[in-house]
């Protein structure tokens, strides 16, 4: 189940998920909990909630990259394997610290707290036993290209990455790939 921003096929485009619209109070309760437990500077437009689901190896296609995962419930196992861990880096121009890929394979324990991972790198859930509910906070790569109505509704529901201005939030600026200098053939890759 995905709360928040989703891409709807059939010409609809970016929208508020049906479950978010159908259960706005539940959505506000969950986003409120997420905002109080995540690092305060992490913006998110969407929340994926899974019940007893172990994701196979995949890459998140519409995710700008940085994602936080946490699992709840009485279970053992369920770590997240990722092919490319984030490592801390420093911007040469500003001296500002940020995270980037390049850390190599990593296994993250998702129980008991939020763990940062790169949704654009291959990842999967390791086997587990018991009851497991996982929450993944992320931002859709079109979080800043929403209609005014959709952006407003997402903010009302508690999502912190939703706009119609096309400008990246500072947190995400380093993760956006600028393809404007590539040839058309390179852009299709």
Say what each PLM segment does.
Residues 3, 19, 54, 167-171:
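A general marker of short, structured functional hotspots
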Residues 130-188:
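Double-stranded beta-helix
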Residues 1-41:
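Non-heme Fe(II)/2-oxoglutarate
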Residues 2-5, 32-33, 80, 159, ...:
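Intrinsically disordered, compositionally biased terminal peptides
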Residues 7, 13-16, 76, 98, ...:
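Polar low-complexity intrinsically disordered regions enriched in Ser/Thr and small residues
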Residues 26, 39-128, 132-146:
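Catalytic core of non-heme Fe(II) oxygenases with the double-stranded beta-helix
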Residues 1-2, 6-7, 13-14, 176-189:
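Extended non-catalytic scaffolding segments
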């Amino acid at each position: 189940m995905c709360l928040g921003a989703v891409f709807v096929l059939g010409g609809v485009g970016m929208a508020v998920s049906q479950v978010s619209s159908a259960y706005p109070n539940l959505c506000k309760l969950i986003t409120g909990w997420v905002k109080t437990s995540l690092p305060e500077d992490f913006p998110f437009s969407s929340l994926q909630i899974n019940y007893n689901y172990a994701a196979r190896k995949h890459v998140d296609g519409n995710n700008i990259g940085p994602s936080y995962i946490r699992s709840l419930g009485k279970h053992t196992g369920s770590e997240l394997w990722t092919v490319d861990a984030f490592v801390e880096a420093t911007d040469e121009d500003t001296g500002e610290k940020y995270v980037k890929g390049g850390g190599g394979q990593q296994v993250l324990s998702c129980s008991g707290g939020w763990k940062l991972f790169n949704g654009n790198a291959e990842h999967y859930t390791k086997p587990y036993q018991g009851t497991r509910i996982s929450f993944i906070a992320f931002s859709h790569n079109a979080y800043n290209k929403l209609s005014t109505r959709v952006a407003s509704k997402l903010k009302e529901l508690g999502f912190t990455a939703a706009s119609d201005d096309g400008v990246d939030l500072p947190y995400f600026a380093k993760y956006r790939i600028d393809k404007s200098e590539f040839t058309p053939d390179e852009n299709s890759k």
